[in-house]
Amino acid sequence: MTAENFLWIFIGLVIFNFVFTTVLEYLNDKNWKNDIPNDLKDFYNAENYLKAKNYKIERGRISSISSSLSLIISLAMLYFYGFGFISDYAISLSDSIIIQSCIFFMILHLFTHILGIPFSYYSTFIIEEKYGFNKTTLKTFIADNIKGLIISSVIIIGLTSLAVFVIDFFSAGYWLSLIHI
């Protein structure tokens, strides 16, 4: 099997996942009942149930827009050699395969995080505010984003370093070492 075949399989799986998730989200939103299900009548009054339903549907729309943008950007990155450009850049900064891999994934992570901020902001300060769920201030929002970025970066760097070390250490037979983990 050629690299091009793997690329097309990967693209097909990404598109399938997007379509499958979008259809499921649509079907879930479409099948919300206006009347409270009997199992929930003890927990919700009609007004709160309708509020929860509308909130969920509105958040789903933002999620769909975000997912669509992610798909378009991912496909554009593949088509226009964006991932290769990032890889070449990472390679130019270090001779260490571990550092190169960490730089590559951190650039992708930063890019993804920055693209997600407007959607997160809208969800928090527009949608949650509309339904009375928002208790977040702009200062808290910014602090949470910075903390989340730092924590996720530490995790990404740690896992990437470990994975690349194992692959590099065991070379061609690295997958055999995974059986023993």
Kindly give the residue locations of the regions a language model identified.
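Juxtamembrane "helix exit" motif at the C-terminal ends of alpha-helical transmembrane segments
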Residues: I72-L93, I156-W175
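Membrane-interface segments at loop-to-transmembrane junctions
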Residues: K56, K130-K147
